C-alpha cells in the first residue's frame, strides 16, 4: 500500500518578513523563492503485517528575493528573461530557486491566466518541473483600516490544473508531536560561509565529521576490542570448567561403581564363611625347634583329644628363618631327649602306675611355684637373665618349649 504526501514547510520569520515587506510597500510585490526540495520514503509496520509505505515530498522555503518592480523578469505576454533572473539571484544559484511569489491587494485567492503562463515559462527556463507559486492576498476587514486579513496559499501545477499544497509553519505550534522535525538549514550569506570555512578545520575533519565524534568512535572501537578479548577469555574459562565438571562426573561414577563392587563382594563373603588360614610362621618355627616331633606338627586330633601324627604338616613354605625370625636361632635351647622308639619307628608311650601319675601334678606345681618366686624378684630382669639363674640355683629341668 503506497501513499504520496506533499507539503510546504516555511519558518515563521520567513513568512513574517513577506508580510512585513508587503505592508511597507505601496503596490503589489513579487519575487523569487529559494529553498530545498526533499523526497522521503517512510514505512509504517502495523500489527496486521501490512507495510504502509508513504512517499513524503517536502519543500522547505528558506529565503525570498524581492524584485524592484513588477514584471521585472518577464514581459507582458509572460515570456521569462533568463538574464534578468540571473541578475536578480546575484550570488545565489539557479538550483536554489524552488518557485516564485506574488502579493496582490484586495483580490481573491485565485491564480490569473497571466500568472499561469509566467509559471509555465519559468519552469521551462529553469528546467525545474517542481516549481511552486506562493500567492498572498491581504485585505481590510474594517472600514477604518485597523484590522487586516492576509490569506496565503501555495500552488503546484499538474498539467493545466493548479492544486493547493498544505503549508506548515514551523514555529506556530507543535504540528508533529510524535515525530522529529527534519528541517534544512536556511540559505546562508557569503560572510557566514566565509567564517564557517575559516574555522571549519578546528571542528570538522576532511570527511565532514566532528573531531570529537572521531575520537569517541576510536574509543568505542578500543572498548569493543577489549570486550571481545574479555569474552574470549570467559569462553575459554567456561570450556575449562565444563571439562573439569565432566572429569568430576567420571570420577564420581567410578567411585560409585567401586562401592557397588565392594558391596557385592562383602555380600558374597557373608554368605560363604571364610576358610581358616594356616599359621605358616608358627609351623616353620616348630619344624626348626622340634624337627623330629611330628606330634607337635600335626593339625588333627582324634575323638579322645590326642594328636594324630599321620596328619602332620610336611609342606615347605619357603620361609628363611634366619632372615624372618632371627631370634629363634639365637635363643635355641639344647634339644630335648628323644623318647624311645618302638619297633615301628614311632614313639612308644609307657604307662605309669596310678601313684606316679598322681604325683606328677604335685611335682609340676612345686616347680611352677619356685619359678614364679624367682621371676617375681625384680621386674627389670629379662628372660635371658632369669633362665640361667633358675638353671644353676634350683637345678630345674630345662623345658623344651620354644622361647619367643
Swiss-Prot record:
Post-translational modification: Phosphorylation of Ser-401 of the pSXXF motif by ATM or ATR constitutes a specific recognition motif for the BRCT domain of BRCA1.
Biased composition (Polar residues): 391-404
Subunit details: Component of the BRCA1-A complex. Component of the BRISC complex. Homodimer. Interacts directly (when phosphorylated at Ser-401) with brca1. The phosphorylated homodimer can interact directly with two brca1 chains, giving rise to a heterotetramer.
Species, as recorded: Salmo salar
Major localisation: nucleus
Keyword match Transmembrane helix: no
Annotated spans, Disordered: 339-404
Residues that span the membrane, as ranges: none
Residue numbers covered by motif pSXXF motif: 401-404
Protein name per UniProt: BRCA1-A complex subunit Abraxas 1
